[in-house]
Amino acid sequence: MEQVADFDTIYQAMIQISVVLCFALGIIAGGQR
């Protein structure tokens, strides 16, 4: 079982999602100004 590889993939996916969410929130905050 390659749990380490799966965890690494999930970890990278979470980082990408976090970056996208932060970018989206930045646009929303900028638009609300």
UniProtKB/Swiss-Prot annotation:
Give the UniProt subcellular location, in the record's own words.
Virion; Host membrane
Q: Which Pfam families match?
A: Inovirus_G7P_2
* Presence of keyword tRNA-binding: no
Sorted alphabetically, the Gene Ontology cellular component annotations on this record are: host cell membrane; membrane; virion component
Give the source's domain of life in one word: Viruses
> How is this protein positioned relative to the membrane?
Single-pass membrane protein
What family does the Swiss-Prot or TrEMBL record give for this protein? Belongs to the inovirus G7P protein family.
Which keywords appear in this protein's UniProt record, sorted alphabetically?
Host membrane, Membrane, Transmembrane, Transmembrane helix, Virion
Q: Report what the protein is called.
A: Tail virion protein G7P
The record lists the lineage as: Viruses, Monodnaviria, Loebvirae, Hofneiviricota, Faserviricetes
Please verify whether the record's keywords include Cell division: no
Species for this entry: Enterobacteria phage M13 (Bacteriophage M13)
What role does this protein play? May initiate with G9P the virion concomitant assembly-budding process, by interacting with the packaging signal of the viral genome. The assembly-budding takes place at the host inner membrane. In turn, G7P and G9P are present at the end of the filamentous virion that emerges first from the bacterial host.
> Which InterPro entries does the protein's record reference?
Inovirus_G7P_2 (IPR045539)
Instruction: Report the transmembrane regions from the record.
Output: 10-30
